[in-house]
A protein has these predicted regions:
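C-terminal effector modules of nucleic-acid-centric enzymes and ribosome-associated factors
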Residues: 141-143
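Short, Lys/Arg-enriched N-terminal segment that forms or immediately precedes the first helix
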Residues: 31, 161-169
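N-terminal regulatory/effector-sensing and dimerization cores
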Residues: 15-109
Length: 213
């Protein structure tokens, strides 16, 4: 059977390679990322260490080894590594982690947590993350492989975590991704002027400026 790679074994230079959405990062003790507005949705899995995080959902929360949180696009997030921290970030734009039926069910039938707490990394999720570390270290990755890993993560979260657990992921996603700020963050690089951005979103320029203020 002929190779689909057509003899090109350098995956980083393959035409099918895309930006990697799964990143393995180690922060040294004392590393501080000031409060900033997230330009992507991401799930932060803390494999080792302790990290102090601060956001609207996780105000002054100590994230410990074996826990994870989600931060939605447009939300403000700050972090401080209390010890050396080993992390895996999974970044995404659209909430592809759930089927529409499950997402809508949680939105309608399951209330958001009164107090948000990090979720535990169960063994099945740990296996997925350990496997991801071993061969997803490059800046780029095969498009088909990344698609499979997205689906695998979606399956693990959807199959092994309850609706109540997933509510702490779904509700922030819905809150931020349906908003005006999310639209601006996702699209401002695609245009050159405010007028073009307003037109892209179906706004009149006066309405766009009023909402943006």
């Amino acid at each position: 059977m002929p190779s689909i790679c057509q003899g090109n074994w350098d995956c980083q230079n393959c035409p099918k390679a895309v930006g990697n959405a799964i990143a393995h990062i180690i922060y040294q003790r004392g590393f501080h990322r000031p409060a900033h507005k997230c330009e992507e949705n991401f799930i932060l899995f803390l494999m080792k260490g302790e990290m102090l995080v601060n956001s609207q959902e996780y105000a002054g929360t100590m994230l410990r080894e074996g826990e994870f949180i989600l931060q939605a696009i447009g939300s403000k997030f700050e972090m401080l590594a209390m010890t050396e921290c080993e992390c895996i970030y999974y970044r995404f734009v659209q909430p592809e982690l759930f089927c529409d039926l499950r997402f809508n069910h949680i939105m309608k039938e399951v209330s958001p947590p009164l107090i948000y707490s990090p979720l535990k990394i169960i063994p099945e999720l740990q296996y997925f993350l350990n496997g991801s570390i071993t061969y997803l270290k490059g800046d780029k990755v095969c498009r088909e492989l990344l698609s499979l890993k997205r689906k695998e993560l979606a399956f693990v979260l959807g199959y092994y975590y309850s609706d109540y657990d997933l509510a702490s992921l779904v509700h922030p996603l819905s809150k931020y991704t349906n908003g005006f700020q999310c639209f601006v963050i996702q699209n401002y690089k695609k245009v050159k002027t405010v007028e073009e951005l307003a037109q892209l979103g179906g706004y009149t320029i006066s309405t766009f400026r009023r909402i943006f203020q």
